[in-house]
């Protein structure tokens, strides 16, 4: 988070890092759908896992000079705002997701899958990414934001290994923010209509922030216009008005 060499001398006593690695991924239980006691037990065990990783870094991690351990590493309660220096709440890498009017699939955003789709359709499409000439993610006419990150999944509790492959700069479709069954709920983060695979690129914080902005604007627009979120997306006039509103506020909805 902080490289002290990029600041005025004395601004920071050292670098500050936020550790979110597979080594401290806790996969031994759920925080939801269980009793409060069980949930807290998993949180406590997850903290111990993080402390174990810190201890390994302090004592056994290989150093460039051939030695082991970085004993100067320490927790920062003053930065985290907690007594123990760990995070205030657990970071949930993959959330539960809604059953949405539209679900983003790997074939919409994965680079290799898009190449296969383009070959099947007999065209190469419009270029939006210079390093991948002629190839672009699926275009969504109801786009309410953009994002760009590779599809990156950590090992799972089911035994799956790393999944890490390229995606293309993509859009956030409004249909992925609309539940099929519930009409008065708008997801505002990584809980939109994606799959286990595509959540790997839509879960990133900048994308979540874009989703949150779109969700807030959608709620406000729906109230002001006395419309349901579904009616806004599924009526061309209302969708156009909503997209014009968010674009006026500086929201980018495509990569053109």
Language-model features, listed with the residues they occupy:
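Flavin (FAD/FMN)-binding glycine-rich loop and adjacent Rossmann-like elements that form
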Residues: 1-256
